[in-house]
């Protein structure tokens, strides 16, 4: 499977991580940051549920559906930043997140923050899970088994439910996109605004 919708997951993950960053006011630093990241990952994963189900059960190309959802995500977060979550009467933006929700800066006057170490840790963990565990093998087999319009029988011959593995894989990739968006808001810009742009999802395809 090819998930081209990471940008969409990043947008919605960033929006709701930013929302959680100012909405919850009675939390300590680590609790608040953890909650914001968890919400961003959950929303990012949920954003990928529809294209995953369409791919597995209806044979709809996940490339087409996730690209479309990228545009839907841009329109959705634009509406939310201009409407329900808007705080600034001049600029379409959410309120600034609370200090308890901020990822700490490594260097003064720099956007380099502890989110970098979170990203490195998650990348190492993902590599280990995908290549060194049974769960990771099932994920790779399930994704590779989606050939043509419908899942091939290769995975089922191995006793691996390819449809379930494919859905879980899409949700996990969406969660990682939501994590990336959350780190951007919590560690760099400190609030969500309409003009915030994410191109890292497409950059990740090349990497």
What do the PLM-derived regions correspond to, one by one?
Residues 8-12, 34-42, 64, 113-120, ...:
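Hydrophobic alpha-helical transmembrane segments
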Residues 25-30, 55-58, 82-91:
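A cytosolic-side transmembrane-helix exit/cap motif
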Residues 107-191:
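Helix-loop-helix "hairpin" substructures at the membrane interface of multi-pass membrane proteins
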């Amino acid at each position: 499977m090819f998930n081209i919708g990471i940008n969409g997951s990043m947008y919605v993950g960033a929006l709701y991580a930013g929302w959680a960053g100012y909405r919850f006011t009675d939390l300590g630093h680590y609790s608040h940051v953890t909650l914001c990241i968890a919400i961003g990952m959950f929303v990012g994963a949920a954003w990928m549920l529809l294209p995953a189900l369409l791919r597995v059960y209806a044979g709809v190309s996940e490339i087409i559906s996730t690209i479309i959802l990228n545009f839907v995500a841009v329109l959705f977060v634009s509406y939310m930043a201009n409407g329900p979550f808007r705080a600034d009467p001049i600029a379409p933006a959410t309120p600034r997140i609370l200090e308890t929700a901020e990822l700490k800066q490594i260097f003064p006057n720099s956007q380099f923050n502890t989110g970098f170490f979170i990203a490195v840790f998650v990348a190492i963990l993902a590599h280990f899970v995908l290549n060194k565990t049974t769960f990771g093998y099932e994920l790779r087999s399930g994704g590779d088994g989606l050939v043509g319009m419908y899942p091939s029988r290769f995975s089922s011959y191995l006793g691996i439910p390819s449809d379930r593995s494919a859905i879980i894989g899409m949700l996990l990739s969406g969660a990682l996109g939501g994590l990336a968006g959350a780190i951007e808001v919590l560690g760099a810009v400190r609030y969500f605004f309409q003009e915030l742009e994410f191109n890292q999802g497409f950059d990740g395809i090349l990497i």
